[in-house]
């Protein structure tokens, strides 16, 4: 499946768990009009990702409960999925291609 934009993902009928997750992220982008409010600006999105990585790092280094670490990881995953929507990249295919390149 090639990369889809927000509207395509919102209209898409998911056929597996990955597509269901992507649709949920796209619906969040659509609900808050990220595309129309600079939320798809990659400089801004990368800054958010760095901030979330910092929060994950702090949770780990301060010995926070695993639930808090998991929440920060989920934030990062949602952001990465959103990056792929903003850039119209098929993240699942890119993931699979990368794993095949490193022979997994």
What are these model-predicted stretches?
Residues 1-63:
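Extended low-complexity intrinsically disordered regions
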